[in-house]
Regions:
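Positively charged n-region of N-terminal signal peptides that target proteins for export
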Residues: 1-4
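Structured, solvent-exposed acidic/aromatic patches
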Residues: 69-450, 491-496, 504, 628-630
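Hydrophobic helical h-region of N-terminal Sec-dependent signal peptides
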Residues: 6-14
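C-terminal/domain-terminus segments
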Residues: 230, 234-235, 242-244, 356-357, ...
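C-terminal structural cap/anchor segments
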Residues: 428-533
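Membrane-proximal, proline-rich intrinsically disordered regions
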Residues: 20-73, 327, 337, 348-353, ...
Length: 630
């Protein structure tokens, strides 16, 4: 009996192991694998980056790049309660990338596919840098620990160095010779640089530059960070040819999937008629920043009666930074306004190659939450006062096309960061030269995305729809004049100010770089007037009003910029009472992740707890001149 039992047991074990082997073979099914080659992760990881544009719906209004009738709570420096709005970057980092990205990097390292591993780490550093500037404190050390039901938060001063470390490791791996044969697989799955390791190295250096650039207002920036920024800047994107652009397929309704079209294009209709160019971007790009009476805060009505006065009925600040209204003089007109901003003028595209006509167009900006602005009504990004429609707008224009690439990083952006660093170090010569190069690079980027419209020749409006209202030839002509003119080429070392650098950077980032623009505004505390190291209640704002620097204050960085409850005309609103008078300094963590499942960890944060009513007003570490005031 004992022998029979042993025989049966051996037989059962043999049967069990055979069955198990057969079962496990299912996991090697080519149609339903549980493990894929590392390179197959890449296209999906990059594609997730389109979600960064989703969160621009919040940060573009927060940075006053756009007004919105949709994300109005963010336009009002608040947040959407009980909602995942503005939480897509969080979702990308922790879920869409998450373990997929970790697996790709680890598998690539095991395969000695160093280029792919380096790309993965560059992707991680870039995404986390953006997320850390938006949500500030994050679960990092425990983020991907298996089995955890809650995750402790790490502070920004710990996360920032780790982001740079990931980028440094990416550079190291990308510089190694692969011991893996990709064939065409890497090129075909990389929508940004088509597997070009040298370009990814520049990109990773750029991530470090952007990370360090948010620290320029810290007391130790020059001694601790400036030289690092410049070192990496010299190795980052060098020209518009290096720009990090993620391709899209386009195709409108003919595309296999809707998301193959750009999020901002005509077909997907996400900008439609609910997002508009702000009055601030229109003012600085058209040279119409007004004069405010510092006693009353009101704009000063002009006594002039010419045609320009009927367009802009207020006295203008005599010291415009970007451009002015003297368009008949060479170099006073910035042609980027004709590409980046929209106008309802010239709907037949007859004059896109006529300099005088292009210069005389009128541009209108929105209020914070509506198309109607202080001097007129802003059109949508396609130049009309209605929802986007292929019959009228075609495939779109500029970077608002169905097939437009997603803009991740530009050489202009990097050079503005370097110019700011040089300026902070007192090296005005290099600051000036780098600043001029940055503006030229943004001109090159801007014209590269133009899709000039075609004249209608008397046909119905919709016969040849869409496109940009300036030709490439005219843009280049006017760009050359502008670069040689009084706002760029004729600026001297002694005349260069921080306003020149940061406001030109703001224009270059419009609107794809709203996340970085909002970071810059926060690190300079929105040009709020305060004493000491940082603003607080009754030292920069009251419960009802923000006290901002006047444009005549030489220390004011963003001339013409005023928050909603400021002391000037068209800005006399109020914030939600839960802000206690403060502007917004951060995006709250994704609701369905943290407020539903990780609230205890969130509530432990200091100096303002993550479950506090005014957590969105907690100042980030990068904006404190020293450390956190714990």
């Amino acid at each position: 009996m004992k022998k029979l039992f042993i025989v049966l047991l051996v037989a059962l074990v043999g049967f069990a192991s055979t069955s198990c082997d057969d079962f496990l073979n299912v996991n090697e099914n080519k149609d339903a694998p549980d493990k894929v080659d590392a390179y197959l992760y890449l296209a999906g990881l990059e594609s997730a980056w389109q979600g960064l544009y989703y969160d621009l719906r919040a940060t573009a209004p927060l940075s006053q790049m756009m007004g919105t009738g949709s994300y109005t709570s963010y336009a009002a420096n608040f947040y959407s309660k009980g909602s995942d709005a503005a939480g897509e970057t969080w979702r990308i980092a922790y879920w869409l990338h998450g373990m997929n990205l970790e697996n790709m990097v680890n598998q690539a390292k095991a395969d000695e596919a160093w280029t792919l591993a380096g790309i993965g780490l560059a992707i991680k550093a870039y995404t986390w840098d953006i997320m850390c500037k938006l949500q500030v404190e994050l679960p990092m050390k425990q983020a991907f620990e298996v089995g955890r039901l809650s995750h402790d938060y790490d502070y920004q001063d710990e996360i920032y160095p780790q982001i740079r470390a990931w980028a440094e490791e990416a550079i190291e791996l990308l510089s190694k010779e692969d011991n893996f044969a990709y064939g065409t697989k890497l090129k075909e799955n990389d929508r940004v640089f088509q597997g070009d390791a040298d370009q990814w190295i520049k990109f990773a250096h750029g991530v470090i530059v952007n990370n360090l650039a948010s620290l320029t207002n810290k007391k130790n920036f020059v001694s601790e960070y400036a030289n690092q920024l410049l070192q990496h800047g010299k190795l980052a994107l060098a020209s518009a040819n290096d720009n990090a652009l993620m391709s899209t397929v386009g195709g409108a309704a003919d595309a296999q999937f809707s998301i193959y079209n750009n999020f901002w294009g005509v077909y997907r209709g996400n900008l439609s008629n609910s997002y508009w160019q702000s009055d601030y971007i229109v003012q600085i790009m058209t040279g119409t920043v007004p004069v405010y009476d510092e006693t009353t805060g009101d704009k000063v009505r002009t006594s002039k009666s010419d045609s320009r006065a009927t367009y802009y009925p207020y006295e203008l600040n005599p010291k415009q930074i970007i451009a002015d209204t003297l368009v008949e003089l060479a170099g006073h007109f910035d042609p980027r306004v004709a590409a980046k901003l929209s106008t309802s003028d010239d709907i037949t595209y007859e004059d896109i190659d006529d300099a005088d006509s292009v210069k005389m167009r009128r541009y209108y900006g929105s209020s914070f939450t509506g198309a109607s602005g202080p001097i007129g009504t802003a059109p949508n990004v396609f130049g009309r006062f209605a929802v986007s429609n292929k019959a009228y707008d075609g495939t779109g224009r500029w970077i608002f096309r169905d097939d437009a690439p997603y803009v991740l990083m530009t050489s202009a952006q990097i050079k503005f960061c370097m110019a700011e660093a040089y300026f902070k170090m007192g090296d005005k010569a290099n600051a000036l030269a780098t600043w001029k190069d940055a503006i030229k690079d943004d001109m090159d980027f801007t014209v590269s995305q133009l899709l000039p419209g075609k004249a209608k020749d008397g046909a119905d409006y919709g016969a040849l729809p869409g496109g940009d209202k300036i030709s490439k030839a005219l843009f280049n002509q006017l760009a050359a004049e502008y670069l040689a003119g009084p706002f760029v080429g004729q600026i001297t070392e002694s005349e260069l100010t921080l306003s020149h650098i940061m406001m030109q950077k703001y224009v270059a980032l419009w609107p794809w770089g709203a996340n970085e623009a909002w970071t810059d505004l926060r690190k300079y505390h929105y040009d709020i007037k305060y004493s000491g190291d940082y603003p607080t209640l009754d030292n920069g704002w009251t419960l009802t009003t923000v006290d901002q620097k006047w444009d005549t204050d030489e220390s004011k960085v963003y001339k013409g910029f005023y928050l909603a409850p400021a002391q000037v005309q068209n800005r006399r609103g109020t914030y939600n009472v839960e802000n206690y008078g403060s502007p917004c300094y951060r995006i709250r963590p994704r609701y369905n992740s943290e407020y539903m499942w990780n609230l205890n960890s969130l509530g432990a944060l200091k100096p303002i707890a993550g479950d506090a009513l005014n957590y969105q007003c907690s100042i980030p570490w990068f904006a404190y001149p020293d450390g956190y005031p714990m």
